[in-house]
Amino acid sequence: MTDEGRIYGRNPVLELLRSGGRRADEIAVLAGARGPLAEVVALARRAGVKVSFRTREQLTAIAGTDRHQGVVARVASAEYADLSGLLEIPKRRGEAPFFLALDQVQDPRNFGALLRTAEAFGAHGVIVPKHHQVGLTEAAARAAMGAVEYIAVARETNLVSALETLKKSGVWIYGSAVGEGSPAWTVDLTGPLCLVLGSEGEGLRPLVARTCDILLTIPMAGQVGSLNVGAAGAALCYEVARQRALGGKTA
């Protein structure tokens, strides 16, 4: 699921095939494949996907990078979910909504890591703005290590309007802040919620911050003043999962 219609790397391609979601048009594999690459070939053939064997140089030309790990998949262009579709996911599962919203995160590695984090800790979807925000690129898909095949991503023209729509559906909006707000583990995070993380350099934009019902902080014990957005997202998503597993017990 990338804008360019290609994904590469062993784990992303394996998860593409295991998920049974989007169909790959072709899997190009390094000739003489063994180990994980042999598993890719077996899964692709089982799914009826065309497999071709290429030299390393040919794979580099197809992927546009030499970091393909011996496999490149041609897939359909990215399809983003819509917000109403995201809201249906927790309803179908009978769970309290848990969404992650990103306010202009621009590094594809951070975006991919956050998609992986969100999926790992049980988020029902991720919401991003259309502008000044990295999309589902090859680099983001690689950083997500296959998580893009399992988690829905909605891309909205106006993030504030999207958050207001969530509020009308009974979802509380919790923003990540530095130096102000309540420590995350003192707040009950078991109800319907959306965590909002700001950009790498600026954090939450003022209007986005004002839209939040509560601002959360991650208390720091060391000398550094903050975490990057990927690390902060991991800490907060873990806290949501921890509280829900413990039935709402805060620190």
Predicted regions and their residues:
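Short beta->alpha connector loops at strand-helix junctions that form conserved
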Residues: 55, 76, 103, 129-130, ...
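Short basic, glycine-rich beta-strand/loop surfaces that mediate nucleic-acid
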Residues: 62-76, 144-147, 152-154, 190-198
